[in-house]
Amino acid sequence: MYLEQDGRRYDASLWLTPEGNCAGVAKMVHIMQAAQFYERDYYTPSEEGFLVFGTPWGRVGIVICFDRHLPESIRTCALKGADLVIIPTANTKAEPMELFEWEIRVQAMQNQIFVAMCNRVGREDGMDFAGESLIVHPSGDVIYKADDREQIIVQELDLAEARLWREQKRPYLRQRRPECYL
């Protein structure tokens, strides 16, 4: 969503409680500026980093659109204890959707978290949005993949399963050695 706050404009996503109250606002951190993507012309990058929200079922992070292309985004949510990362995005059919699917699958597996990417559909201002929203298991397997039509996806996830993968099945995060990284 487009958000104006303190004289600045953001690409943002609201975190709503089951009662419909706003419990937080996640803002895009990395703003794309390249041919056909002039987002810095109208968006300000967030200085708040990546937010993770507690729920009765588990912890949920939000990574907005372009942020997902930088692996630190989803990794940060995982290190903050996210069991699920939600990625609202707006990819067009001209973009490499198969590559984007693999990108999400690999990051879900590397971070042992569920990832749900929700993409736009339809046509606006000459752009055809791809849809193909998907939900990925901590193993990297696709649980559900939508087509290019508007639809509502209802999928039950056991978020405790992400913790099981992180702690027992593939404890990759525990193997990290940040002192050896740049």
What does each model-identified segment do?
Residues 4-80, 93-102, 167-171:
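Active-site catalytic loop in hydrolytic enzyme cores
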Residues 12-15, 51, 133-135, 153-155:
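Short beta-strand scaffold segments in enzyme catalytic cores
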Residues 18-21, 56, 138-140, 157-160:
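Short loop segments at secondary-structure junctions
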Residues 162-182:
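A conserved C-terminal secondary-structure "cap"
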